Amino acid sequence: MVEIILPDGSSRSYDQETLTCGQIAASIGKGLAKAAIAGVVNGQKVDLDAPVPHGAQVAIITEDSPEGLEIIRHSASHLMAQAVKTLFPQAQVTIGPAIENGFYYDFDYERPFTPDDLTAIENCMRKLAKRNEKVERRVMPRDEAVAYFQAMGELYKAEIIGAIPAGEDVSLYSQGEFTDLCRGPHVPSTGKLKAFKVMKAGGAYWRGDSRNKMLQRIYGTAWATEADLKAYLTQMEEAEKRDHRRIGKDLDLFSVQEDAGGGLVFWHPRGSRIRRVIEDFWKDRHVEAGYEFLYTPHIANRQLWNTSGHTDFYSDSMFSPMEVDEQAYQIRPMNCPFHILIYKDRRHSYRELPFRWGELGTVYRYEMSGALHGLFRVRGFTQDDAHIFCTEQQIEEEIQRILDLTLDILRTYGFSDFEINLSTRPEKSVGSAAIWDKATEALRRAIVSRDLSYVVDEGGGAFYGPKIDVKITDSIGRKWQCSTVQLDFNLPERFDMGYIGEDGESHRPIMIHRALMGSLERFFGILVEHYAGWFPMWLAPVQAVVCSITDAQHAYAETVLAALKKAGLRVEIDLRNEKVGYKIREHTLKRVPYLLVVGDKEREEGTVNVRLRSGKSLGSLPIQDVVERLVEEAASRALSASEDQEEA
């Protein structure tokens, strides 16, 4: 007799000596049995055929759940490795994890894989999946596993296993003639893998170290159903059209100059105009929210990074030290220690708290060249950083204020679908259980008080405090992590921060880190792709272009330009000797919201013929009316003109 407890608290008894998750799923219903791909026994993910002990708490993982998708993708990486070994027996397998929306596997092979190779690999995967080969787990002593893979010529696998402590067992998974090292769990058979596609190939260094050999990495995606796969591929096609790197070049917004080094962004005049609008809006909102602004250095003595702990815990992401006056200095990867030094510059009373200090601070972090990607992964970027120093009693109110400010700013940019995660105390942490519980509850209450739904990430907090993450959803359904609100019990301790409390004693302040956009560069890239470059008028680098029809209107066109510029609008003029239709098409492709055409009729009447980039004509309007219209639209931060409902 085996009795188990289900997630809803109910129990089930089975009159048999051994029991598996697969049998439990089948006993509950045919639908669950069909959708099941793994189980959770006493909090541990296991294969469907793993034995379930008496009294265990059991849950079934289905293919459409986040956990199920991760297992499908990991199993698909094994299927791809099996296909590669079938087609290219000399290739050595290395590692192949599941990643967001897919998977990859790295191979040591004599040449890069071609597009034809990738097609052949995918076709082979489909044949292997149709065989519906059983996926079997076995456990082997470490030394025996090393010898096993060495005998097969899989030296990378042998190296990985060799790093495991002696005397430990390792688990292997086999399907057909293919065997791989893996913790699992995996799908019960290859037939469970129905919706997948090989996407692309590239290079990757072994263990991510440029001193090691370059391997061949193949990426793929896998989903529970063909419909989900099709929807994802459609989304990826749309994302390719919206690629911020291409649009950034087309609209002359920014560049990455390899002569200066990878991952370093150069903002061109038009991109700088948008950045200035973003920065000014950010500052205005923060002034309204009671923040003060700081300006701090870009480098600091290495001793500061020793005190903050960055030298011990973050050195791999920091650039190498430079020597100044026989002392080591390093460029900053974060702004936090600088704000703390300003706090410590004098003593503080509880009456002064909270301090809300913000800085658009540029930081520098080392990234492998292969990881760099447009504005999304760079080596130098500007954080919309702020730190709040407050008392324990002020935490909840400050978090509420931060959430209000965050959502207000994100909504203004056109984002309205949010996913909020609350990450709690991990196994290893600093600070007492009492302060963790109190702070976590304050974060939870702040979220609930704003009628926001959220997901708890148990144990997912940093070692120094709980946090809130806010993800936004863009116009094609992709989710982006942007905003983070992080409590910190560590740095106030390391820097011996304090304030005099109402009782006359010294107390530690609570430190709250928060970035609402994350970094200006990455957020700008998200905006470019969200709007596909069709920015709302208030964000557009060029809000209007004045186009003359012939030379006879040049002087009048300049008058119109001057009136618009005087009103603070971002306007350009096109006096080229080209047909007006050509000019309109060109500036429409440049996504300019307003095209202002002036001919003899407009010059004589003191008007402007107004066209929207959607193709709609508003007819001829007096100059002052046009100025007022554009100023009002820009000031309102409308996401589209009332007559211009073209979607990005």
From Swiss-Prot:
One Pfam family cited in the UniProt record for this chain: tRNA_SAD
Provide the cofactor list for this protein: Zn(2+)
Q: Report the gene name.
A: thrS
Disulfide bond entries: none
Query: What does the record give as EC number?
Result: 6.1.1.3
Family annotation (PROSITE patterns): AA_TRNA_LIGASE_II, TGS
Q: Where is this region: Catalytic?
A: 243-536
Q: What is this protein called?
A: Threonine--tRNA ligase
| Chief location of this protein within or outside the cell | cytoplasm
Organism in which the protein naturally occurs: Magnetococcus marinus (strain ATCC BAA-1437 / JCM 17883 / MC-1)
**One BP term from GO:** threonyl-tRNA aminoacylation
Q: Which Gene3D superfamilies match?
A: 3.10.20.30, 3.30.54.20, Anticodon-binding domain, Bira Bifunctional Protein, Domain 2, Threonyl-trna Synthetase, Chain A, domain 2
Cofactor binding summary note: Binds 1 zinc ion per subunit.
- List of residues binding Zn(2+): C336, H387, H513
Can you say where in the cell this protein is located? Answer: Cytoplasm
Which keywords does this Swiss-Prot/TrEMBL entry list? Aminoacyl-tRNA synthetase, ATP-binding, Cytoplasm, Ligase, Metal-binding, Nucleotide-binding, Protein biosynthesis, RNA-binding, tRNA-binding, Zinc
- UniProt-recorded Gene Ontology molecular function terms: ATP binding; metal ion binding; threonine-tRNA ligase activity; tRNA binding
Q: Which family does it belong to?
A: Belongs to the class-II aminoacyl-tRNA synthetase family.
- Domain TGS, by residue range, is 1-62
Task: Give the protein's biological function.
Answer: Catalyzes the attachment of threonine to tRNA(Thr) in a two-step reaction: L-threonine is first activated by ATP to form Thr-AMP and then transferred to the acceptor end of tRNA(Thr). Also edits incorrectly charged L-seryl-tRNA(Thr).
